[in-house]
Amino acid sequence: LRIDLITNVSHDLKTPLTSMVGYMELMRKEELNDTVRDYLDVITDKAAKLKEMIESLFSLAKASSGNVEFHMETLELNRLVEQIYGDMEDKIADSGLEIVTSLTEQDTGLVSDNMYLYRICQNLLENALKYSAKGTRVFVKTFYRSGIMGDQLCLEVTNTAGYPMDFQKEDIIERFARADQSRTTEGNGLGLAIVSTYASALGGAFDIDIDCDQFKAKVTFPITEKEETETCEEDGLS
């Protein structure tokens, strides 16, 4: 019932918001003084953030309900990470943070949905940029690990928090829960909840490790027998 309510409310909010954005675009075509134009810029920016939040909420509710159709294809995790770097180049530069990357030289092919996997990786990096202490480094790492559940491909993002992390790791992935309880930065609290929900829906897992001021977020995806066979064939081992 709660998921249905969120889905319906999110959908109903889209129509008036779209109308508001349309009227703001019409206003831009008018002759406005600098003060009014500055106000319009602020309203437009806030409307864009509201639209992003509504779309995230709608997408999260849909994925939580299991009512989503994935378009599975073979993807390269390393290549996706590099693509996100390019797409977020301005945000990374504006953050003033140093991104330290360590991508495995092994094949990072996996069968997944490009849009959802992209959003997972993007949210992890955005979360690190948003909540890191100034002048610190963000570590992005891809690697393989083996265990009783078989081989897994992992993406790990580690940052130094710019605030006291006086919370339990279970709290951080709750919908609308935010690590920064003082609300000193912008955000709607959906970022890591989306990562957790999407990863689970794609057959993976999401975990967080907190050690003093170090915040480590990790997603893992199982490597299927088909993927392992394809990797062996590419390496000339079959």
What does each model-identified segment do?
Residues P164-A177:
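Short conserved segment of the HATPase_c
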Residues H71-T74, A93, E98-T108:
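Conserved catalytic submotifs in the C-terminal HATPase_c
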Residues A128-L129:
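Short helix-loop "hinge" at the ATP-lid/N-box region of the Bergerat-fold HATPase_c
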Residues S65-F70, G109-S112:
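Conserved micro-motifs of the catalytic ATP-binding
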Residues D45-L50:
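Short alpha-helical segment of the dimerization/phosphotransfer core of two-component systems
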Residues H71-Y85:
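A conserved beta-strand-to-alpha-helix junction within the catalytic ATP-binding
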Residues G203-C212:
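Glycine-rich ATP-binding loops of the HATPase_c
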